[in-house]
Regions:
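A polyanion-binding, active-site-adjacent surface
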Residues: 1-187
């Protein structure tokens, strides 16, 4: 099947008045880079949106293409990077180059109360943002379900819904849904 790829930087989407922000690493090569919408059209999206739907944070359990009718409820999804990093391993320069876009999206969401960071790099990107822009001090260790209160926000660490993490059972629906429900209780 021949498809035309979006092939441009991918920005966040969702409820601009949302109280929950989900932060991922980067657009998937054959997901968001193909479709133009973050967490759309790949295995990570399949797992994530099944969990978001069961948690009451989306109107449907699938995210396949831009015109599939998907709507997030009180939630906005963004990325640490806007383009696919080679071998899914971003360099420090790539993260720094995208930090301005990350900052703009975080600042755009005025009602944010909870951030769920999907994976260590997304988590570290959030912490770095608050250290640089809000004077945050200290060290913060990533782990699934860790919770930190930072500048009036709560930040959760969550294992990324990658096929590797799902197939090895590092993350499963029960764990992810439980974490999203914990996030909802804080809003």
């Amino acid at each position: 099947m021949n498809q035309i790829y979006w092939g441009k930087p991918v920005s966040g989407f969702g409820d601009l008045n949302g109280e929950i922000i989900i932060v991922g690493l980067a657009p998937a090569a054959h997901g968001a880079t193909r479709t133009g919408r973050v967490f759309t059209g790949d295995k990570s999206a399949d797992f994530l949106f099944k969990c978001l739907f069961k948690s009451g944070l989306s109107n449907q359990s699938n995210s396949e293409h831009l015109k599939d009718g998907l709507k997030l409820k009180n939630t906005f999804i963004t990325l640490a990077l806007r383009c696919v990093p080679p071998n899914d391993k971003p360099t420090k320069d790539e993260l720094n180059n995208c930090s301005i876009f990350f900052k703009e999206e975080l600042n755009m969401i005025k009602n944010k109360k909870v951030i769920v960071a999907l994976g260590k790099i997304a988590f570290d990107t959030c912490i770095k943002f608050y250290k640089k822009n809000n004077g945050l001090k200290g060290s913060f260790k990533f782990g699934h379900g860790v919770k930190y209160h930072i500048n009036g926000l709560t930040i959760f660490g969550c294992y990324h819904p990658s096929p590797r993490n799902v197939n090895t059972k590092r993350i499963n629906e029960t764990k992810m849904i439980y974490l999203f429900k914990r996030a909802k209780k804080l809003i």
